[in-house]
Swiss-Prot record:
Alphabetical UniProt keywords: 4Fe-4S, GTP-binding, Iron, Iron-sulfur, Lyase, Metal-binding, Molybdenum cofactor biosynthesis, Nucleotide-binding, S-adenosyl-L-methionine
Binding site for S-adenosyl-L-methionine: Y33, G73, S124, M195
Family according to the record: Belongs to the radical SAM superfamily. MoaA family.
Subunit annotation: Monomer and homodimer.
Protein's name in the database: GTP 3',8-cyclase
Pathway annotation from the record: Cofactor biosynthesis; molybdopterin biosynthesis
UniProt-listed Pfam families: Fer4_12 (PF13353), Mob_synth_C (PF06463), Radical_SAM (PF04055)
Gene that encodes the chain: moaA
Gene3D superfamilies the record matches: Aldolase class I (3.20.20.70)
Length: 334
């Protein structure tokens, strides 16, 4: 009863029980849809310390959060990330600690992360062609990422999920091959419509947009898709494959089928801004609270609760429209 009475409820009666925490804005890739090629990263004093990140996680779990996802940038380039995972995973009441990674550091870190208590991994994979993969990531090594995926499987992670951002004319001819790759390794895969965050020069977003409906129609030419009621507590909607019971295909559709009505999420940027919506700038500065009142759990809890009235009902992303959010995805928490 005490947990219910302390639950985080926004102004539209949505229960907030999922926190996405960015632990760094830095990354060893420069993906074309995520950041500028010459990205300027934040100085260390501007980002939350590992202890500050833990304090926020601890307070959210005390307020009923049951799922935390660690993001970046690339979370595995943050020194001390394995220890942070261990501390957060041990919080009483937390059901799931997940991470989204580009996979490059998993050959050496998959086993330590699993041993520390990380529950699940999402791994970005936008192409199976080495040259194309390098073009999309600007610096990435496909073989290294595949080695990371295999290391995660050996470490014991279950329900590993691949994330693919679909860009028309750049990787949309690989949809079937990516699903077959997932089937071969008994992985889930989610296809994502590009998020319109930050001004990019690599491609015109309106021209590169590929809707989830189009992706699903193309896959249906090769596979039998069975709609599922399963949920990962996030925005993805899943289909089962008649041809492969161990693989689910998901779709995240911020443009064509937005998931705002049931949104249960907030995001913490590495600067300590609590973002109430991916597509809005409404935020609460938790870093200011953490540093002005170190160790004061009550003040931190009050700031979190006070922020909920800022959460809007929905975002207003438009395909091909003007960029409304200037922060890049790596600054938001991917």
């Amino acid at each position: 009863m005490e947990q219910n009475s302390r639950a985080l409820i926004d102004g539209f009666n949505r229960k907030i029980d999922y926190l996405r925490m960015s632990v760094t804005d830095r990354c060893d890739f420069r993906c074309v849809y995520c950041m500028a090629e010459d990205m300027q990263f934040l100085p260390r004093q501007q980002i939350l310390s590992l202890e500050e990140l833990f304090q926020v996680a601890e307070r959210f779990v005390a307020l009923g959060t049951r799922k935390i996802r660690l993001t970046g940038g690339e979370p595995l380039v943050r020194q001390g990330i394995v220890d942070l995972c261990g501390r957060i995973a041990a919080l009483p009441g937390l059901r799931e600690l997940c991470m989204t990674s580009n996979g490059s550091q998993l050959p050496r870190l998959a086993q330590p992360l699993f041993d520390a208590g990380l529950s699940r991994l999402n791994i970005s994979l936008d192409s199976l062609d080495a040259e194309r993969f390098k073009q999309l990531t600007r610096t990435g090594d496909l073989a290294q990422v595949i080695a990371g995926i295999d290391a995660a499987r050996r470490a014991g992670f279950q329900r590993i999920k691949l994330n693919c951002v679909v860009l028309k004319g750049r990787n949309d001819d690989e949809l079937v091959d990516l699903v077959r790759f997932a089937i071969d390794r008994e992985l889930d895969i989610t296809f994502i419509e590009e998020m319109p965050l930050g001004v990019i020069s690599e491609h015109e977003r309106g021209e590169s947009f590929c809707s989830s409906d189009e992706v699903r129609a193309r896959l249906a030419e090769q596979f039998t898709l069975i709609e599922s009621t399963e949920s990962s507590q996030g925005p993805a909607r899943y289909w089962r494959l008649a041809e492969a019971s161990s693989t689910r295909v998901g779709f995240i559709s911020p443009h064509s089928h937005n998931f705002c009505a049931t949104c249960n999420r907030v995001r913490l940027t590495v600067e300590g801004r609590l973002l109430l919506c991916l597509g809005n700038e409404h935020s609460m500065d938790l870093k200011q609270v953490l540093r002005a009142h170190p160790g004061d759990a009550e003040r931190l809890e009050k700031a979190i609760r006070d922020s909920l009235h800022l959460k809007p009902y929905r975002h207003h992303f438009e395909v091909g429209g003007d960029v409304q959010i200037l922060r890049f995805m790596n600054m938001t928490g991917g």
